[in-house]
Structures are given as structure tokens and as C-alpha cells.
């Protein structure tokens, strides 16, 4: 075990949404300098976090499709490291190193912790439960407590700590100078690795049909999710191709660059809409509007069952556009309406969103204080 004055901290990450928060958390622990840090990552988070590996001890967790192998790997990892504190991400869809660590690690009064990046998001694969969930706001805390019966700590959203350093207007200008061409409208299409019957494909087809009926020059920039399979990506491209809609590749752009450059950011219910809202919070001018395609009954039902939510958080009060009927699709391409919605969304975000820059500092102080005092939280 690590010495009390220098606790050994094991942090894990599997999903891209978790990776952003973990990166900031690792940097804050390094700045603090009071811990021995080990980071265990699994694809696709490994790809997202590669730049920080040289700063700390890193373990690349292999893709182990057999559950018993994954559990045995986690147990061996814990036996070798003997961490004082365990902090995991939360996977989904699917499960991985985060869940098996939560399910198999030894527990004390506070550890293990799970970092939540979406309201009420939990994953209890293998019976995984954190002792404490680190959540983004009071709404997330309420949902998580209801689902798990476990304590929560509101720390804000760590992922966005550095967003206030972005010159969003310059990023937008540079992107559009390179990409805009003669387009009247630029739309980012954010892919998701959803296999809920064929409801996701039906949703995309309806959107592609509506696009195909437009007489504007509209550029569609497609950014697949890292966990979308080759077959899923090709299916998406085929859906749009059949409607005569060209998808421009957006995978090689940084996510923030893509979001800043768009007029609309369209997905079924991707957290990229929340990323965009966080960029709007630090932008001096409107950028784009999140658009959620929530009109297909089976997909909407799947969302509610998977998340435990009735609606997409932060999508009311002008913070986003939620399409609840196919008949509403044509209206989102009206240029005057887009300009109006962009301004409304920007103003609403700045009025209603909490400030997120201190989340990692709050989390590290809380975790180390709990370790030092062995304060009983559960």
C-alpha cells in the first residue's frame, strides 16, 4: 500500500466522454503533487489520452471480449498496484475496465469513486457501484442517488476546464475559411454507436430525406463516434448517399474545432450537444445550436430506458432544438430561423449554465481530504 502521505491513486477510463474529464483530473493531481498516480485506459479512451501518458505510469488495457478474462485482468491489476484510491469512468454503451474495477476493488469509507459525465449515468455491469459518484450538478446528484442509493458530490463538469482558453471566434473563422465553400449552411452530423433495432437508421434516413428536399447549398460534416463500427459508418454514409447528400469527413478535426465551425450540430442525443453548449458559455458570439432527433418512437424509448431520463437535459428554454416529429425537420433549415435560434441558444446558455472551470480542483481536494480523514460518506 502507498504511504499515507503519498497515496497510490489508480484512475481508469474507457469512453471518450470520460477521457476528457480524466485528462483534466490527472493534470490536477499532478499539479497537486501529493499522490503516486497510475492510469489504466482502454480503447477508445487510450487514443484520446495518449498525450498525457509520458507524465505518469500508464497501463494499456487490452480489449478482452470474454468477461472472465476481463475480471481476472482487473483483479490481477489491483493485486499488483495495491491502490489506496480508485477512481473510474463510467462506460456506455457496453462495459469495460471501469465496471470491473468498481466490481472487484476493495472498498473503504470513500473509495472507489466514479466520474459521471452525463446526468444520472451509471453502469452496474458485474454489480459495479461506486462508493461515491462525482457528478456535474444538483440534478445529476438527485438522479444518481435515486438510482444507486450511494452518496454523490457535485463538482461541476471537469471536461470543460480549459474551454475558457479557446478563442471560439477565431477557431470558427479558420474552419469556415477552409471548409465553407459556397455553402449556405454548415451542419455537423455527430454519429453514435446505437444498435437499437433499426430505429437509429430510420432516424438518419428521415433526416437525409429532409435534406434531400432542400434547395439550399448545405454542407454536412460527418463525425463518427470512435465506437461506431466500420459497418455502422458505412450504413450511415449509404443512407445519405441514396438521397444525393454528400457527407464530408469530420473525423480528423478536433471536436471543438468542428463544433465551433457549424451552424447546427445534429445527433440523436449525443453529449456533443452539451460540449457545444459549454463552448457557447465562453464564446462572445453565437456559434451553433444543438439539434436532437427524438421523433422515432423506438429510439426515444431506448434513450429513456438506457439513461433513465424522460428528456435530454439542458434542451429546454432555448438551449437546443428537439425534433419530436418528422414534420418538424424541414423547418430547421430555414436560414432566418437558424440565425434566430443561434442567438437564442447563446443567450440561454449564458443565462442558465453553471461555471465549470473549478471541477477538477474541487474533486482532487475532496478525494484527498476523504483519504486523509477517512471520513465516512456511506
Identify the function of each model-found stretch.
Residues 10-30, 34-167, 193-195, 227-228, ...:
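Active-site and donor-binding regions of nucleotide-sugar-utilizing enzymes
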Residues 58-63, 246-251, 317-329:
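Short acidic-hydrophobic, aromatic-tinged amphipathic segments that line or gate anion-handling sites
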Residues 234-251:
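Nucleotide-activated donor-binding/catalytic signature segment of Leloir-type glycosyltransferases, i.e.
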Residues 278-339:
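Nucleotide-sugar donor-binding patch of glycosyltransferase catalytic domains
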Residues 317-378:
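C-terminal amphipathic helix plus adjacent low-complexity
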Amino acid at each position: 500500500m502507498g504511504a499515507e502521505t503519498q497515496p497510490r491513486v489508480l484512475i481508469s477510463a474507457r469512453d471518450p466522454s470520460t477521457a476528457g474529464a480524466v485528462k483534466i483530473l490527472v493534470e490536477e493531481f499532478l499539479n497537486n503533487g501529493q499522490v503516486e498516480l497510475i492510469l489504466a485506459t482502454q480503447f477508445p479512451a487510450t487514443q484520446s489520452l495518449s498525450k498525457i501518458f509520458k507524465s505518469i505510469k500508464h497501463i494499456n488495457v487490452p480489449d478482452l471480449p470474454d468477461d472472465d478474462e476481463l475480471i481476472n485482468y482487473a483483479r490481477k491489476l489491483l493485486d499488483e498496484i495495491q491502490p489506496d484510491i480508485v477512481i473510474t469512468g463510467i462506460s456506455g454503451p457496453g462495459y469495460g475496465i471501469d465496471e470491473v474495477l468498481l466490481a472487484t476493488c476493495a472498498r473503504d469509507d470513500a473509495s472507489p469513486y466514479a466520474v459521471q459525465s452525463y446526468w444520472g449515468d451509471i453502469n452496474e455491469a458485474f454489480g459495479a457501484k461506486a462508493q461515491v459518484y462525482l457528478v456535474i450538478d444538483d440534478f445529476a446528484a438527485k438522479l444518481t442517488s435515486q438510482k444507486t442509493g450511494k452518496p454523490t458530490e457535485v463538482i461541476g463538469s471537469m471536461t470543460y476546464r480549459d474551454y475558457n482558453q479557446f478563442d471560439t471566434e477565431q477557431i470558427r473563422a479558420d474552419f469556415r475559411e477552409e471548409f465553407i465553400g459556397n455553402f449556405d449552411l454548415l451542419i455537423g452530423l455527430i454519429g453514435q454507436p446505437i444498435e437499437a433495432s433499426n430505429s437509429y437508421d430510420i432516424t438518419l434516413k428521415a433526416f437525409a430525406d429532409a435534406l434531400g428536399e432542400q434547395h439550399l447549398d448545405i454542407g454536412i460534416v460527418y463525425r463518427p463516434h470512435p465506437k461506431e463500427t466500420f459497418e455502422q459508418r458505412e450504413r450511415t454514409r449509404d443512407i445519405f448517399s441514396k438521397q444525393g447528400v454528400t457527407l464530408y469527413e469530420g473525423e480528423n478535426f478536433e471536436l471543438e474545432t468542428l463544433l465551433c465551425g457549424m451552424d447546427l450540430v445534429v445527433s440523436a442525443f449525443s453529449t456533443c450537444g452539451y460540449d457545444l453548449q459549454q463552448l457557447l458559455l465562453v464564446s462572445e458570439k453565437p456559434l451553433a445550436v444543438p439539434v436532437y432527433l427524438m421523433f422515432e418512437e423506438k429510439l426515444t424509448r431506448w434513450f429513456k430506458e438506457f439513461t433513465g431520463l424522460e428528456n435530454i437535459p439542458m434542451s429546454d428554454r432555448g438551449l437546443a432544438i428537439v425534433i419530436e416529429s418528422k414534420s418538424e425537420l424541414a423547418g430547421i433549415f430555414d436560414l432566418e430561423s437558424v440565425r434566430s435560434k443561434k442567438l437564442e441558444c447563446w443567450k440561454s446558455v449564458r443565462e442558465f449554465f453553471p461555471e465549470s472551470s473549478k471541477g477538477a480542483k474541487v474533486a482532487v481536494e475532496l478525494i484527498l481530504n476523504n483519504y486523509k480523514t477517512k471520513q465516512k460518506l456511506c
